Amino acid sequence: MPCCLRRSILLWLALTMTGASLRAEEPAIERAHAETWRRFIDEHGIMRDYVGELPTPEDCRLGKPNAIGWWSPIENGPMFTGMYLHAMVERARRSGAAADKDQARRLAQGLLKCASVSDVPGFVARGVGSDGKCHYPLSSDDQMHPWFLGLHAYLLSDIPSADERKVLVTKVREVAGVLESNGWRVPCDGAFKGDFRGGFKGEHFRDAARYLYLLRATYDIDREAARIRSAGLPDVLAERLRL
């Protein structure tokens, strides 16, 4: 990830999402946000890693430079977009500005786009290439988690319209259902269709935290308690997740 984008994302997220005494009119914050938006948010509402030549359908099909899309402008679309959306929802809550709500809405549509370009149910693409649809075949858990993070924050806000909310809830339910049916593993596309890359039920410490978060987030969104019950969690923990 280029240092300039890393700095912009960390600056924006840190300053927007903490309790520091910062105001929207702070010039440095506004310049960072405006420049990040101008340079890295594409026409679909997906954040790119950097400004550069987009992969073509052939590049994506052949896995150039690799099937994961590493070192391409569309390597981390859901990761960056989901985190940025989480911050934009908070910014809109604080400011109440229509422009902030519009930008949050655009980012939510970007996440929806990432989950709508494949015929593999539950697949969330890393981004889209030059034709607005082509994508690399391998997603990952580090893309999937921020995808839920952003949409969770957005759908708990008052920003989406009733129609938009219905579409997004349906998509979240679809993706969550596929993950659950696959043992919370992340599906692949293209030449790797039927395989998985990453998941949320491993033995690492982060898997426990992210798995519990996904259960709570999806319940907040679709109110389906059966998903929590089927996880086999202790009764006390299951009840807390449904609070």
Each language-model region and where it sits:
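N-terminal secretory signal peptides that target proteins for export/translocation
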Residues: M1-L5
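Bacterial N-terminal signal peptides
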Residues: S8-G19
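Low-complexity, Ser/Thr/Pro/Gly-enriched N-terminal "stalk/linker" regions
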Residues: A24-M79, R105-R106, G110-G127, D163, ...
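Solvent-exposed loop and edge beta-strand segments that line ligand/cofactor-binding
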Residues: P65-Y84, D131-Q143, C188-Y211
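A structural signal for well-ordered alpha-helical segments within the folded catalytic domains
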Residues: P78, G82-V89, D102-R105, Q109, ...
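Well-ordered alpha-helical scaffold segments within catalytic/enzyme domains
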Residues: G82-A97, P146-D163, A209-D222
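Elongated scaffolding segments in large macromolecular assemblies
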Residues: A162-D222, S230
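Acidic, His/Gly-rich catalytic cores of divalent-metal-dependent hydrolytic chemistry
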Residues: I221-L243
